[in-house]
């Protein structure tokens, strides 16, 4: 397993639409293992493959709290359907938009179909934080970031803030 670099805005790769996975094999499982290790190292709760530069329809997630045992989840070729009419606001952040948080409204319940780590077909209803997180990560697979839901001014400020943070990190590393 390896920790991979997480791409940040305004990297154009983040705007690419991810492609379906043909099969769940050892190479894909290695990618998912790397993604999970990368997500944990960055203190995230979800990560899409495109965020590590791989345009495949793969998501890893772990919504366990810091005082709970890890509960990793894997979603290959996920498909969302039947969103609830009820929208709820949640404050979202993103490993690809570090230090930026804002409130986004999303359906609080949604149906999801996917392949798991072993390639088994699964389906379930996502609610609450799980629903928010899976929709956020699914947006990544379509080349959409949570800041795309914000006003143009807020989006520009977010990108500038990330550039400043990244520049500061580069200076500190030198």
From Swiss-Prot:
Q: Where does Fe cation bind?
A: 94, 136, 140
Catalytic reaction annotation: N-terminal N-formyl-L-methionyl-[peptide] + H2O = N-terminal L-methionyl-[peptide] + formate
Matching InterPro entries, A to Z? Peptide_deformylase (IPR023635), Peptide_deformylase_sf (IPR036821)
Q: Which residues form the active site?
A: 137
State whether keyword Protein biosynthesis applies.
yes
**What Gene3D superfamilies does its record include?**
Peptide deformylase
The molecular function terms of the Gene Ontology recorded here are:
metal ion binding; peptide deformylase activity
| Keyword Cell membrane attached | no
**Superkingdom to which the source organism belongs:** Bacteria
Q: How is the cofactor bound?
A: Binds 1 Fe(2+) ion.
| Family label | Belongs to the polypeptide deformylase family.
Briefly state the protein's biological role: Removes the formyl group from the N-terminal Met of newly synthesized proteins. Requires at least a dipeptide for an efficient rate of reaction. N-terminal L-methionine is a prerequisite for activity but the enzyme has broad specificity at other positions.
Which protein, by its recorded name, is this? Answer: Peptide deformylase
């Amino acid at each position: 397993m390896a920790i991979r670099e997480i791409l940040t805005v305004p990297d154009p790769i983040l705007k690419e639409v991810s492609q379906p996975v043909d099969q769940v094999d050892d190479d894909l499982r290695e990618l998912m293992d790397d993604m999970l290790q990368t997500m944990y190292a960055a203190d995230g709760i979800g990560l899409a493959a495109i965020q590590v530069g791989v345009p495949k329809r793969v998501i890893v997630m772990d919504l366990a709290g810091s005082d709970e045992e890890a509960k990793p989840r894997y979603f290959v070729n996920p498909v969302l359907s039947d969103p609830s009419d009820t929208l709820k606001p949640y404050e979202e952040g993103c490993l690809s938009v570090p230090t930026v948080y804002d409130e986004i409204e999303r359906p609080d319940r949604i149906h999801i179909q996917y392949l798991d780590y072993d390639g088994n077909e699964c389906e379930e209803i996502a609610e609450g934080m799980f629903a928010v997180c899976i929709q956020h990560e699914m947006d990544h697979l379509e080349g959409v970031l949570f800041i795309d839901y914000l006003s143009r001014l807020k989006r520009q400020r977010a990108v500038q803030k990330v550039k400043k943070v990244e520049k500061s990190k580069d200076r500190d590393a030198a």
